[in-house]
Regions:
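Short, internal strand/loop/helix patches
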Residues: 87-107, 114, 128
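Hydrophobic single-pass membrane-insertion segments
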Residues: 1-11
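C-terminal cap of thioredoxin/glutaredoxin-like
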Residues: 1-3, 36-38, 48-52, 57, ...
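Loop/turn elements at helix/coil->beta-strand transitions in domains of secreted/extracellular proteins
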Residues: 29-32, 62-66, 93-98, 125-131, ...
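Short active-site neighborhood of thiol/selenol oxidoreductases, capturing the structured segment around
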Residues: 27-48, 67-68
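Short histidine/acidic/glycine/proline-rich micro-motifs that form metal-
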Residues: 42, 72-76, 105-110, 169-170
């Protein structure tokens, strides 16, 4: 495992696509963090609750970095695919991040029941329920979610959460210091963030 992590750090993908996925922060921020995540993954929830707030405060809110969320629902999580579709349906009504947040904040509540809760959350966010239900029930975002998943596979993503910081992979809900060290290197400019830390 140690060898795989070390090897992974050397595999740099300079052009990780952000597709048309949701962006948190200034779209023109100099550093791009692409997150491949699964709403039902407990480690993804840990990242959301414990690490993302620090990244948000220090890098996103200050215009240094932007976060792009891409779906990577794992097969072992029964409701992950539909949760991802639900967030994309909410995004169609301009509330992707609000829905993203409600899914992670309430992961324990919906992970065994799924769709009924997804519709309830849409109501909580005052989304147009008819439009949301049609989107979710009709699988309108299934291809979008699948495209993210396949892109992640092509980039070597095997689990969640998985990040690319200006193309540099970082796997798992790492401590904030790991993100900070890599982002700071990228802020220095040029290829500095492509060098081993």
């Amino acid at each position: 495992l140690v060898w795989l992590v070390a090897k992974n750090k050397e595999e740099i993908i300079k052009d990780v696509s952000i597709d048309d996925d949701a962006i948190k922060g200034d779209p023109d921020a100099p550093v791009t963090i692409v997150e491949f995540s699964d709403y039902q993954c407990p480690f993804c929830a840990t990242f959301y609750k414990n690490i993302l707030p620090q990244i948000q405060e220090q890098y996103i809110d200050t215009g240094i970095a932007k976060l792009v969320y891409r779906d990577f629902p794992l097969g072992g999580h029964a409701h992950a695919q539909k949760a991802a579709e639900a967030s994309e349906c909410a995004g169609e009504q301009g509330k992707f991040w609000e829905y993203h947040d409600i899914l992670f904040e309430n992961q324990d509540d919906w992970e065994t029941v799924g769709t009924g809760k997804f519709k309830e959350y849409a109501g909580t966010l005052e989304l147009d329920s008819e439009t949301f239900d049609a989107c979710l029930d009709g699988g309108e975002m299934a291809d979008e979610v699948r495209a993210d998943f396949l892109a992640g596979r092509n980039y070597g993503v095997t689990g969640t959460p998985y990040f690319f910081i200006d193309g540099r992979p970082l796997s798992g809900a790492q401590p904030f210091s790991e993100f900070s060290a890599l982002i700071d290197k990228c802020v220095e400019g040029g290829d500095s963030c492509l060098i081993d830390l």
